[in-house]
C-alpha cells in the first residue's frame, strides 16, 4: 500500500503553503454578506470553490476540498493542478444555536480508499474545543480519524478550533488555544492546523511569545489558519508563527475572501487572490530557508 508522507503536501522547501476551500455554510453567509442574491444557491458555492481550485492550486502545495459542495466536481473537472496535492475534509458540520458549525462529527460517509484513488493524499478533521465538553470524546474522535487515515495510507490533519464554553460566559481564547494544544498536540496526527494567537494583531514581540508558547505544546508539524485574521496581517502572522516553529499555513479567507461576491470571479481570483497566495508561498520558503 502506498503510504503518503508529509513531503507529499509540502513545497520543495519543506514548508506548507496550502489553500482551503472547504468552508460550507460559513461561505454561504459570506456571499450573503457581500450582497449576493439570497438564498445563496449551492451552485454559487460550488462554482466559486471549483474556480478557486482551478486558478489557485498551481500556487499551493495542497488544496483542501469538502465533499458537500466541491470535491466530486473538482475531481471530475480536473480542477486541481498536478503539482498540488488534494486534501479532503472528513468532518460533518452540524449547525445549531444560530451558528453554521455548532458541532462536528467524523463523516461516516467518507470512503478513504475511494478518495485516495481519486488522488487525495490527506484527510482533515475539524475538532471544536470547549473547556466544558468531554476531552475524552474529542480524543476518541481524533484516534478514530487517525486510524481511518493511517490504515489507508493517507495523512491525518487535525484542526482544533476553540469555542466559548456551552455554559457560562468566561472565555479566554488565548488560553483555550493553548489548552487545546496541550490536549491534542500529541494525539498521533501528522499535522496540526491551529488558530493564530491574538488574531495576528498587535506587537510582533507579543505574537512571537504567544506563538512560541503554542509551539511548546504541539508535538507534530503545525500550520496556521487565517479565519479571524485581517488578510493584511496574515503574511506577518505566517512569518511570526514560522519563526516560533510553525511550518506554514492552510488558509482560505486570507487568500480569497476579498473577491467573494465580486463580478468576473475568475478574473478576480487570478488578479487579486493568486498574487496573495504566491507571496505567502514565497514567505514560507524564505522562513524554511532560515532553518537550514
Curated annotation (Swiss-Prot):
Gene Ontology BP terms: 6-sulfoquinovose(1-) catabolic process
Pfam family, one: DeoC
Documented EC number(s): 4.1.2.57
Alphabetized GO MF terms: 6-deoxy-6-sulfofructose-1-phosphate aldolase activity
InterPro entries: Aldolase_TIM (IPR013785), DeoC/FbaB/LacD_aldolase (IPR002915), LacD_aldolase (IPR050552), SFP_aldolase_YihT (IPR017291)
Domain of life assignment: Bacteria
Active site per the UniProt annotation: 193
SUPFAM superfamilies, sorted: Aldolase
Entry keywords, A to Z: Carbohydrate metabolism, Lyase, Schiff base
Reported function: Cleaves 6-deoxy-6-sulfo-D-fructose 1-phosphate (SFP) to form dihydroxyacetone phosphate (DHAP) and 3-sulfolactaldehyde (SLA). Can also catalyze the reverse reaction.
PANTHER family: SULFOFRUCTOSEPHOSPHATE ALDOLASE
Assembly mode: Homotetramer.
Membership in a protein family: Belongs to the aldolase LacD family.
Protein name: Sulfofructosephosphate aldolase
Organism encoding this protein: Salmonella typhimurium (strain LT2 / SGSC1412 / ATCC 700720)
Taxonomic classification: Bacteria, Pseudomonadati, Pseudomonadota, Gammaproteobacteria, Enterobacterales
